[in-house]
Swiss-Prot record:
This is Cholera enterotoxin subunit B. The keyword Signal applies. SUPFAM superfamilies: Bacterial enterotoxins. Disulfide bonds join C30-C107. It comes from Vibrio cholerae serotype O1 (strain ATCC 39315 / El Tor Inaba N16961). Keywords: Disulfide bond, Enterotoxin, Host cell membrane, Host membrane, Membrane, Secreted, Signal, Toxin, Virulence. The keyword Transmembrane helix does not apply. Residues 1-21 form the signal peptide. It is found in: Secreted; Host cell membrane. The holotoxin (choleragen) consists of a pentameric ring of B subunits whose central pore is occupied by the A subunit. The A subunit contains two chains, A1 and A2, linked by a disulfide bridge. It comes from the Bacteria.
Length: 124
């Protein structure tokens, strides 16, 4: 009887942990963060600008509709584990711009200007 109760409890615990596991899409991922919102774009990047100038180290992308987003270049304000992810995002955006890939959605932090990219979803 005790084994049965433990088995049921463990199964319920495991099921609920799995249900809240890895996000299945950008909307689920974005919902895990505060101060974020989803932008649905379905368009290619119109311009890509990269700045290494002092306090304005960032990559900036724009779209035809006028939307502007940024990715900060890793600096002293970032911990080591963030630096590689930021560099990968910057590289992804540069490649998307050069190959004219369509950006489906962006999850952005809306408490920065321009909005800072947290996640990207692209579609062919």
């Amino acid at each position: 009887m005790i084994k049965l109760k433990f088995g049921v409890f463990f199964t319920v615990l495991l099921s609920s942990a799995y249900a809240h596991g890895t996000p299945q899409n950008i909307t689920d991922l974005c919902a895990e963060y505060h101060n974020t919102q989803i932008y649905t774009l379905n368009d290619k990047i119109f311009s890509y600008t990269e700045s290494l100038a002092g306090k304005r180290e960032m990559a900036i992308i724009t779209f035809k509709n006028g939307a502007i987003f940024q990715v900060e270049v890793p600096g002293s304000q970032h911990i080591d584990s963030q630096k590689k992810a930021i560099e990968r995002m910057k590289d992804t955006l540069r490649i998307a711009y050069l190959t004219e890939a369509k950006v489906e959605k962006l999850c952005v932090w809306n408490n920065k200007t321009p909005h800072a990219i947290a996640a990207i979803s692209m579609a062919n």
